[in-house]
Amino acid sequence: EMIFKVLFKVDCRINTEAVSISPKNKTVDLKNVETGEQTTESYDKLVLSPGAPSIKPPLPGIDLPGVFSVRTVPDARKIREWLEKGTGFLAGMNRYSGFQTVRPKTRAVIVGGGFIGIEVAENLVHRGFDVQLIQRGDQVLTPLDREMARVVEGFLGDHGVKVNLNDEAVGFKKLETGALEVQTKSGQTYPADVVILGIGVRPDTKLAAAAGLKVGKLGGILVDAQMKTSDPDIFAVGDAIEVKHYVTGEQSLIALAGPANRQGRIAADVIAGKDSKFRGTQGTAIIGLFGAAAAWTGVSEKNLNQMGEKDYEKVFLYPNSHAGYYPGASPIAIKIIFRKSDGKLLGAQALGKDG
């Protein structure tokens, strides 16, 4: 707070919720979540950046202790505190305490095979956990095409993550032992000491919609190229907005840090009088997993088939990460998708341990 105030002259108010906006009066009603005190602030220009909270479906037992969603740093801290309650210096061993046996927490179930699910799975493996990952679809990392995702799934399996595809969690139960049980649509059950939900995010548009701002078909706040909403004095940036996909030209929800950073800078430029515009995003992303990486940009072959696009071709390449006459080179699997009629690059995906 002090850094923002001293260096940037920004009045940063933590523990404060914006509860409503009045575009007509150009005011925002605020509430201190600790004291309940309510205040009103006026604005000339307003920027909304509410983000996209984790999806938490109304499943039986989803609010049980030990079942977590993870999206923010405080979320991660809560999970770490929960894990450390039952580990201690005797992790991996049972110990007798009073009239009960205290068993370290060593079993984890991850629900969801996207960014968050895979990164949490890796970290729990490093902590010595037995990890089960449940994915509703037929592959992890849905932006990848299936043949590329299969490589990722094999790599996860090689490092101890048990990947369960085409299944989904339908409920959670606390057992007499104190452990949790994850119940799935297939009828399979998984015992767990901790359950992490990583089943996606949804744009937070409640405040914007209540203020009468337009929301798109995909559920995000609609903005123009200068990040202005349907009210020219209210801007919106980040995971809560719909943006143009640079390759397809269609509206998309792209919850990535890179585009959000650029959108914030463009909104600031426009407010300051500079004619800046957001050209769209390619959805470029990368994820590390057990010393390797998976990356993608543009559209996948799967996307093109869903769009009914036939004018494309693909090529697979397997170069080394560096010149073969230097030691330590490892192969990189690359898939490139391009338009046949003019050779325009439409998308690319890459997997490898180096390079």
Where are these regions (language model features)?
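Rossmann-like dinucleotide-binding cores of NAD(P)H-dependent redox enzymes
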Residues: 104-109, 115-173, 254-260, 276-303
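AMP-binding/adenylate-forming core of the ANL superfamily
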Residues: 28, 33, 46, 193-196, ...
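A short alpha-helix-loop-beta-strand transition element characteristic
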Residues: 10, 83-104, 214-218, 274-284, ...
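Glycine-rich dinucleotide-binding loop and its adjacent helix/turn
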Residues: 50-127, 162, 223-225
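Glycine-rich flavin
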Residues: 1-10, 22-25, 37, 48, ...
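Mid-to-C-terminal Rossmann-like scaffold of FAD/NAD(P)H-dependent oxidoreductases
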Residues: 240-354
